[in-house]
């Protein structure tokens, strides 16, 4: 069972009835996608009182700089980045939306002239991804990843946090990282998911006030 944090205790009870076999259950309680499913690892262990527990703390996907930054968003104390260094995370504040669009287009141009395979431009919702894709596709070669998408393509992809979960990109641009879009504890989980999709390079871009979910 993958993404254990997204299942409720009731759903686990159903799984146990349907599949009374040994199970391996994996997940990350820092990555909730459903705000109504907020329970703890202790709650899960009560459902499996005789289970063996192993905590995997080493993060191999992202650079040291990206994981260190992500821990400023979600305080996952036990998470240990590998000693693979890269660029510092970029936080870009724009005067208006037009400047924000231009910055994203420049990020796409830099990606296309580099040697990386996949750039993810990640929005908070599917609706926001569709809107941004509609603007970018007039000037750039970009893909849109939606619930209806059947496969993942390299290149530039615009998608939501929901659809990006489980994916990884060489580079990530988090769109609208402002204090209106990301402001609640649940938003903290979403922003953490978005940031940890990046393997080598992470940029957060916004207009207005930067989200307050990034700790000093």
Regions found by a protein language model. Name each.
Residues 5-216:
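Conserved helicase motor core of SF1/SF2 NTP-dependent helicases
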